[in-house]
């Protein structure tokens, strides 16, 4: 049976794992790393780079290197959080045809789901290389506080990448699975997950194979990226103060500052002070300018203190919703790279009154949990029951724009709830049902998931028609809606078409685009391999021709030189073709066979001459005297 893989699709880094016997195992990528940067870059010639290769060239190609795209997934272009991000990233965030936030590289627009799909493809290839077989199914993690649109967009990304997404699982829940799989005693745990772009807190009861989420809360726009940006803003301000130059509009400088900020932040988790040194950051009439600055841990902590404090309110809300106090939490599990920051650990300790548990790898634990869930779905992992919750209340807009809740937040999923509604006016033949998700009292203040019209109602006085609306949340946390007119018995299944999101046609087009890109990538790799082989052959043949050319006829020399020239021309062509290079490589190999034969004969002749010389000198060889030493004697003398 083909393996189902577990993927942690992170804001900053992604990770893939698989069940290996009874244990989940993280798979190393082609670069030998256990995590892959969630970055995609497009070079000027259209080549697509994913992961570490994309990160390596980010400084020289800032406008076409896309990162932290997960923060945009499932969001509208007008979203205030998107507006904020627009001014902080070197690449362009544009408005998609559907009104969603898209990104642009080399003048072409991409949906965040498409970029995420490219990262998922890299994860898929990593797993396939390790397993030696095709991978078609996966469990993908999302922040617990993701809404329906964000979950649907993540599922779309999986489809575009050529994966059947068996389950969307919440990141803190996945971490709890990996942490508690071998725990038999009942425990109440808190999973504090501060990653690259999102923050989640989940309270769970675990024990004897049952993982029950009691509550979840969070902030989908709070993470390591915000900490980096806060430090970048500080560096820009300090440089302006010292040099009078504003680096805010210099995209190349901003990318260098971002890399330096991330590095400094990581270093300050284990040391009290670090130095940021960026030579030639910019130049003015007086010459080049350099940025050199000493940064202490205390200064960093003061810069980001409000960001760390923002995690406290969701933690308190989650405790309240779960009906437990901080003292009743047996263990606090830290997840996400930002949880390594001493200030974060200090705040967690103060909040929960105990040292947080640091026994799991915060970068890998989510992927391991996803692999365990994949094992559960595949039947390889037995006696595990996972009960998750919906993070946000679900309801509809009723008279006066009020948000009427049907399913409260932290309801265990999957779940189904029905409620009967009626018309607001006489002889109303259609009703518009607007479905929203959120915690505000007015529908307009919550996230509109979508709307649909129920038409063909028989003319009646207002309040008479009985329309039963059923909301169904599946195990992925994705919403489906159906409506039934009780008067006529007519039932209609309605799939919410999100106010934004990708249509089936969009997804199909992107799937084809991804497939053609995979074919292009394969073709490009074949061309590079063919070029390498050709250039190696050209080099060795030219050397042999120089050393032994006089051993073959002039006609053979000309044929070899012509074949070399033809192969060089093929490898240097702008649109180099692998098949053409291979054919010309074969031709060169064939015409240079006589040269190879001549070299072999010349070397044989040289070998024969050397043997004769050795035989002549044989009379002068002196026999050496020797004495045999037995093992026992050797041991005594040692």
From Swiss-Prot:
PROSITE patterns to which the protein is assigned, alphabetical: HSP70_1 (PS00297), HSP70_2 (PS00329), HSP70_3 (PS01036)
UniProt cross-references to Pfam families, sorted A to Z: HSP70 (PF00012)
One of the record's GO molecular function terms: ATP binding
Gene3D superfamilies xref list: 1.20.1270.10, 3.30.420.40, Actin, Chain A, domain 4 (3.90.640.10), Substrate Binding Domain Of DNAk, Chain A, domain 1 (2.60.34.10)
Annotated keywords: ATP-binding, Chaperone, Nucleotide-binding, Phosphoprotein, Stress response
Organism: Rhizobium etli (strain ATCC 51251 / DSM 11541 / JCM 21823 / NBRC 15573 / CFN 42)
Protein family according to the UniProt entry: Belongs to the heat shock protein 70 family.
Annotated protein name in UniProt: Chaperone protein DnaK
Positions of region (Disordered): 604-638
Modified residues (Phosphothreonine): 198
Alphabetized SUPFAM superfamilies for the sequence: Actin-like ATPase domain (SSF53067), Heat shock protein 70kD (HSP70), C-terminal subdomain (SSF100934), Heat shock protein 70kD (HSP70), peptide-binding domain (SSF100920)
Bias (Low complexity) ranges: 604-618
Induction and repression of expression: By stress conditions e.g. heat shock.
CDD domains, A to Z: ASKHA_NBD_HSP70_HSPA9
Function: Acts as a chaperone.
């Amino acid at each position: 049976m083909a393996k189902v893989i577990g993927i942690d699709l992170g804001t900053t880094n992604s990770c893939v794992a698989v069940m290996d016997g009874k244990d989940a195992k993280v798979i190393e990528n082609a670069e030998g790393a256990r995590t892959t940067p969630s970055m995609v870059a497009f070079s000027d010639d259209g080549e697509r780079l994913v992961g570490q290769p994309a990160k390596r060239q980010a400084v020289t190609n800032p406008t076409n290197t896309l990162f932290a795209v997960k923060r945009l997934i499932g969001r509208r272009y007008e979203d205030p959080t998107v507006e904020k991000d627009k001014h902080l990233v070197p690449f362009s965030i544009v408005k998609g045809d559907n009104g969603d936030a898209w990104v642009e590289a080399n003048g072409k627009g991409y949906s965040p789901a498409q970029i995420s799909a490219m990262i998922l493809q890299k994860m898929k290839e990593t797993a396939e290389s390790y397993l030696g077989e095709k991978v078609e199914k996966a469990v993908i993690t999302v922040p617990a506080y993701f809404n329906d649109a964000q979950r649907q967009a993540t599922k779309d990304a999986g489809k575009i990448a050529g994966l059947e997404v068996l389950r969307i699982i919440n990141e803190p829940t996945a971490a709890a699975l990996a942490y508690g799989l071998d725990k038999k005693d009942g425990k109440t745990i808190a999973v504090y997950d501060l990653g690259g772009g999102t923050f989640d807190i989940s309270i769970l009861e675990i024990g004897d194979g049952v993982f029950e989420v009691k509550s979840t809360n969070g902030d989908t726009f709070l993470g390591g990226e915000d900490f980096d940006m806060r430090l970048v803003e500080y560096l820009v301000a300090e440089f302006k103060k010292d040099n009078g130059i504003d680096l805010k509009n210099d995209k190349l400088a901003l990318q260098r500052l971002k890399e330096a900020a991330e590095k400094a932040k990581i270093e300050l988790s284990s040391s009290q002070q670090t130095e940021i040194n960026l030579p030639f950051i910019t130049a003015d009439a007086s010459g080049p300018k350099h940025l050199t600055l000493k940064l202490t841990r205390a200064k960093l902590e003061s810069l980001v203190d409000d960001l760390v404090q923002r995690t406290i309110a969701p933690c308190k809300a989650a405790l309240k919703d779960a009906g437990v106090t901080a003292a009743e939490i047996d263990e606090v599990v830290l997840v996400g790279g930002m949880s390594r920051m001493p200030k974060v650990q200090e705040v967690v300790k103060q909040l929960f009154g105990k040292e947080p548990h640091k026994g799991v790898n915060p970068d890998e634990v989510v992927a391991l949990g996803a692999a365990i869930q994949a094992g559960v779905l595949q039947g390889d992992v037995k006696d595990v029951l996972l009960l998750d919750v919906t993070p946000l209340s679900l309801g509809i807009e009723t008279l006066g724009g009020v948000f009427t809740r049907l399913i409260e937040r932290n309801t265990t999923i999957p779940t189904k709830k029905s409620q009967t509604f009626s018309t607001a006016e006489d002889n109303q033949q259609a009703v518009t049902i607007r479905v929203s998700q959120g915690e505000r009292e007015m529908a307009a203040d919550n996230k509109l998931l979508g709307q649909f019209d129920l038409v063909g109602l028989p003319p009646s006085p207002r309040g008479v028609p009985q329309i039963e609306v059923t909301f169904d949340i599946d195990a992925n946390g994705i919403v489906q809606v159906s409506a039934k007119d009780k008067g006529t018995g007519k039932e209609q299944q309605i799939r919410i078409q999100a106010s934004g999101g990708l249509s089936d046609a969009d997804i199909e087009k992107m799937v084809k685009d991804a497939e053609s890109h995979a074919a292009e990538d394969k073709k490009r790799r074949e061309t590079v391999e063919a070029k390498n082989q050709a250039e190696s052959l050209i080099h060795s043949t030219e050397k042999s021709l120089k050393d032994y050319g006089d051993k073959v006829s002039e006609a053979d020399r000309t044929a070899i030189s012509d074949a070399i020239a033809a192969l060089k021309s093929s490898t240097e062509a702008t649109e180099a073709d692998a098949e053409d290079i291979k054919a010309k490589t074969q031709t060169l190999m064939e015409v240079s066979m006589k040269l190879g034969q001549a070299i072999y004969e010349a070397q044989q002749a040289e070998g024969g001459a050397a043997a004769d010389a050795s035989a002549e000198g044989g009379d002068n060889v002196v026999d050496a005297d020797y004495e045999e030493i037995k093992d026992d004697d050797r041991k005594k003398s040692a």
